[in-house]
């Protein structure tokens, strides 16, 4: 029995969107679901109680950062990541691969793993499939990710071909090194850049290894969104229907809706918390940058439709004042709002799937949000 299982409830008659439930050792969550990112074992400025109050069911933490500080051995001795950070719901940890390939300029890829330099102090480090599994087993997350190479985009066909072949070999080593399959589910990551045949090959390789779930990696790395959507349309049908499907690194409202339409169950991104820190807020009518001078005397909430703590209690003028004054409370309030907005959006997406009207919802949302879509009923 896998530690994590997927229960399919229904498919939207308007699209390929799925309503489902993912069951984990620390509880279940409905999908499609957005996962707030807690890079350093905390979702920045947020308490676990606040996250639960806004219906965040699962959060993501970062293997690379927790390995370097405080160390996976410290977290193991604390009783695992759940106890360490006082979060009793499901946790997903990434493998650290994306950070190795995105944060470190000095790296050397070998068959056994990657040599690179610490992004803060320059010390030499080595991360391999075996090491990534050891760290994540110490962390004790419910869902852990295979160690993969995330090729840049654009990259040549030859480079990406060699990369996915290496990722497949690394995936096999991850399965061999995984010590806790009974209470931690290991997901494989499909790569392939913008090349459909390489996405097909990567998917076939990984599906043959029978992981409990699958992610699509290497998208949302700067490519135009039409390319991302084309890769999703090609790749998602290659993934097992009875297992969770996870699109890594996606968190803009339009991409969440488009991903759900194409059959994705799980999403994560630092976007809502990162932009909150400079005063950028997502609302039903588009983004609001509260630092702008036009909000100095705007005594209305960020979003009249929003039921979050921030919108029920504070105005754009007050938020502008806090952000301009570099007050931590301002960052907390904008973070609360952005996370609530995306989690509530996913609740609306699930309800639209339940009622077989996700494309209708997309049209309504895009029009109000101010997204220019020529034919929103197409996908």
Swiss-Prot record:
Pathway(s) it belongs to: tRNA modification; tRNA-queuosine biosynthesis
Entry GO MF terms: metal ion binding; tRNA-guanosine(34) queuine transglycosylase activity
Top-rank EC class of the record's enzyme: transferase
Cofactor remark: Binds 1 zinc ion per subunit.
Positions contributing to Zn(2+) binding: 306, 308, 311, 337
Keyword annotations: Glycosyltransferase, Metal-binding, Queuosine biosynthesis, Transferase, tRNA processing, Zinc
InterPro entries documented for this protein: ArchSynthase1/Queuine_TRR, TGT, TGT-like_sf, tRNA_ribo_trans-like
Keyword hit for Lipid metabolism: no
E.C. number: 2.4.2.29
Keyword tRNA processing: yes
Catalytic residues (positions): 94 (proton acceptor), 268 (nucleophile)
Stored SUPFAM superfamilies: tRNA-guanine transglycosylase
Catalyzed reactions per annotation: 7-aminomethyl-7-carbaguanine + guanosine(34) in tRNA = 7-aminomethyl-7-carbaguanosine(34) in tRNA + guanine
GO cellular component: cytosol
Names of required cofactors: Zn(2+)
Ligand binding (substrate): 94-98, 148, 191, 218
Stretches the record annotates as RNA binding: 249-255, 273-277
Pfam families, sorted: TGT
Subunit structure: Homodimer. Within each dimer, one monomer is responsible for RNA recognition and catalysis, while the other monomer binds to the replacement base PreQ1.
Function description: Catalyzes the base-exchange of a guanine (G) residue with the queuine precursor 7-aminomethyl-7-deazaguanine (PreQ1) at position 34 (anticodon wobble position) in tRNAs with GU(N) anticodons (tRNA-Asp, -Asn, -His and -Tyr). Catalysis occurs through a double-displacement mechanism. The nucleophile active site attacks the C1' of nucleotide 34 to detach the guanine base from the RNA, forming a covalent enzyme-RNA intermediate. The proton acceptor active site deprotonates the incoming PreQ1, allowing a nucleophilic attack on the C1' of the ribose to form the product.
Recorded family membership: Belongs to the queuine tRNA-ribosyltransferase family.
Protein name: Queuine tRNA-ribosyltransferase
Source species of the chain: Macrococcus caseolyticus (strain JCSC5402) (Macrococcoides caseolyticum)
Encoding gene per record: tgt
């Amino acid at each position: 029995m896998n530690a994590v299982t997927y229960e399919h409830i229904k498919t939207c008659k308007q699209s390929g969107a799925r309503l489902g439930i993912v069951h984990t050792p620390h509880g279940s969550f409905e999908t499609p679901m957005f996962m707030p990112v807690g890079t350093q074992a905390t979702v920045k400025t947020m308490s676990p109680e606040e996250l639960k109050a806004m219906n965040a069911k699962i959060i993501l933490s970062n293997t690379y950062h927790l390995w370097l500080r405080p160390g996976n051995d410290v977290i193991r001795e604390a009783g695992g990541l759940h106890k360490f950070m006082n979060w009793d719901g499901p946790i997903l940890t990434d493998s650290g691969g994306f950070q190795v390939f995105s944060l470190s300029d000095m790296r050397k890829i070998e068959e056994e793993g990657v040599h690179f330099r610490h992004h803060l102090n320059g010390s030499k480090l080595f991360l391999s499939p075996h090491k990534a599994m050891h760290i994540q087993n110490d962390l004790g997350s419910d869902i852990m990710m295979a160690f993969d190479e995330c090729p840049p985009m654009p990259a040549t066909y030859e480079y990406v071909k060699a990369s996915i072949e290496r990722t497949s070999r690394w995936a096999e080593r991850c399965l061999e090194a995984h010590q806790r399959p009974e209470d931690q589910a290991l997901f494989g990551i499909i790569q392939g850049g913008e090349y459909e045949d390489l996405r097909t090959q990567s998917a076939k390789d990984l599906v043959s290894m029978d992981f409990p779930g699958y992610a699509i990696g290497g998208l949302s790395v700067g490519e135009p969104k039409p390319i991302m959507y084309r890769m999703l349309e090609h790749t998602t049908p290659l993934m097992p229907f009875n297992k969770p499907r996870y699109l890594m690194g996606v968190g803009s409202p339009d991409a969440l809706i488009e991903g759900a339409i194409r059959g994705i169950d799980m999403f994560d991104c630092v976007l809502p918390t990162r932009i909150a820190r400079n005063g950028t807020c997502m609302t039903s009518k588009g983004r609001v940058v509260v630092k702008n001078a036009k909000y100095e005397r705007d005594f209305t909430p960020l979003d009249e439709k929003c039921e979050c703590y921030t919108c029920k209690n504070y105005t754009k003028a007050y938020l502008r004042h806090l952000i301009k004054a570099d007050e931590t409370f301002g960052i907390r309030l904008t973070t609360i709002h952005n996370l609530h907005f995306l989690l509530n959006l996913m609740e609306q997406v699930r309800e639209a799937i339940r009622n077989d009207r996700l494309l209708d919802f997309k049209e309504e949302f895009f029009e109000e949000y101010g997204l220019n879509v020529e034919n929103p009923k197409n996908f």
